[in-house]
């Protein structure tokens, strides 16, 4: 095993200029991540200078067997925390050979929204709080829980420490450092209310980069849990009963909101989000109705309400934002399995481009 570890950690730059590029894309479920690697002749820093590639879409549920080729378009580059050196991770989106985005390519439409002049002028900032649950591989039950049983009630686990309260911290810290190494603007981590559940935050990130960074952060997490022999779940309500669900609260601001007088802009934006509540809920993740019950720090899925410092609201405004008269707000509706390309671009579209 020591030899295997030595080989995995070989520093290729000592002997060659060639690098390994791991191409990442979203699979047919819209939530599963896939990747494969290729050798390049030397370091690359501009994704548009990377070659396009293809894969068998019939094996990912994205193309029929008789016409199975799907084309990968490189869109964002990150340093590879697994191979290190000059090796890279490449976030791609997916197209037909004719150049049309396939149905699971949500990045394409998001990029169009974020390139709109009105949206560009507002410099949209996002901070996404990604919650997830770590499961025992053999039984798909949260780590730290007795198999077939339950731990003590919620209360001591949120930001808790100790072997009886925090389960999987080595995975969480490994992920934190790996994301920083990769160049992802990960801003923090914490243990969540349900034992075995954790959160990391990505942001502030501008426009389309929020989606790129969150997807690659998810990819890195899945790779680390693969090594650890643990399963990561993004199910919005992995355990039924008196246990918190898992969300992806999305913090948002525009230049107008961050400037003096921005609180009035925030209130107008929230009003527009309320008018499109059903459309947003439909796009905010599968199974969200199991999470948005009006309990466990959520608003009921059929009700739109906002408030200052209210974690039972659809939209929460922070005390500092109210006091300073400018800042940001938090959309608490997105589920943990949401597509960040969809959520971030839809918030921008509804608050900037959409006219009631």
Swiss-Prot record:
Residues 106-356 form the GS catalytic domain. Homooctamer. GO terms for biological process: glutamine biosynthetic process. It is found in: Cytoplasm. InterPro entries: Gln_synt_N (IPR008147), Gln_synt_N_sf (IPR036651), Gln_synth/guanido_kin_cat_dom (IPR014746), Gln_synth_cat_dom (IPR008146), Gln_synth_gly_rich_site (IPR027303), Gln_synth_N_conserv_site (IPR027302), Glutamine_Synthetase (IPR050292). This is Glutamine synthetase cytosolic isozyme 2. It catalyses: L-glutamate + NH4(+) + ATP = L-glutamine + ADP + phosphate + H(+). It comes from the Eukaryota. Its EC number is 6.3.1.2. It is an enzyme of class 6 (ligase). One of its GO terms (cellular component) is cytoplasm. It holds the Pfam family Gln-synt_N. It comes from Vitis vinifera (Grape). GO terms for molecular function: ATP binding; glutamine synthetase activity. Belongs to the glutamine synthetase family. Residues 19-99 form the GS beta-grasp domain. Keywords: ATP-binding, Cytoplasm, Ligase, Nucleotide-binding.
């Amino acid at each position: 095993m020591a030899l295997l570890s030595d080989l995995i950690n070989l520093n290729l730059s000592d002997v060659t200029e060639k690098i390994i590029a791991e191409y990442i894309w979203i699979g047919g479920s819209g939530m599963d991540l896939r990747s494969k690697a290729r050798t390049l002749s030397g370091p690359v820093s501009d994704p548009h200078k990377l070659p396009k590639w293809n894969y068998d879409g019939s094996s990912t549920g994205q193309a029929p067997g008789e016409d199975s080729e799907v084309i990968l378009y490189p869109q964002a580059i990150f340093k590879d925390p697994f191979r290190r050196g000059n090796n890279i991770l490449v976030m791609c989106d997916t197209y037909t050979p004719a150049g049309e985005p396939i149905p699971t390519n949500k990045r394409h439409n998001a990029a169009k929204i974020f390139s709109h002049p009105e949206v560009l002028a507002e410099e949209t900032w996002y901070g996404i709080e990604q919650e997830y649950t770590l499961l025992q591989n053999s039984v798909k039950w949260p780590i730290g829980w007795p198999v077939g049983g339950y731990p003590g009630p919620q209360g001591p686990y949120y930001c808790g420490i100790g072997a009886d309260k925090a389960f999987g911290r080595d995975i969480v810290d490994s992920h934190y450092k790996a994301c920083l190494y990769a160049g992802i603007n990960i801003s923090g981590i914490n243990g969540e209310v349900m034992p075995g559940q954790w959160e990391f935050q990505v942001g502030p990130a501008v426009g389309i980069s929020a989606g790129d960074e969150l997807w690659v952060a998810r990819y890195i997490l899945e790779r680390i849990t693969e090594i650890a022999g643990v399963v990561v779940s993004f199910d919005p309500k992995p355990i039924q009963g008196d246990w918190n669900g898992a969300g992806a609260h999305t913090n948002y601001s525009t230049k107008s909101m961050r400037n003096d007088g921005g609180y009035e802009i925030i209130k107008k934006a929230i009003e527009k989000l309320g008018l499109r509540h059903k459309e947003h809920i439909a796009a905010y993740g599968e199974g969200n109705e199991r999470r948005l019950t009006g309990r466990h720090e959520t608003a009921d899925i059929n009700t739109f309400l906002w408030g200052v410092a209210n974690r039972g609201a659809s939209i929460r405004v922070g005390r500092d934002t109210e006091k300073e008269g400018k800042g940001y707000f938090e959309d608490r509706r997105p589920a943990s399995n949401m597509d960040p390309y969809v959520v971030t671009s839809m918030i921008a579209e509804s608050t900037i481009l959409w006219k009631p």
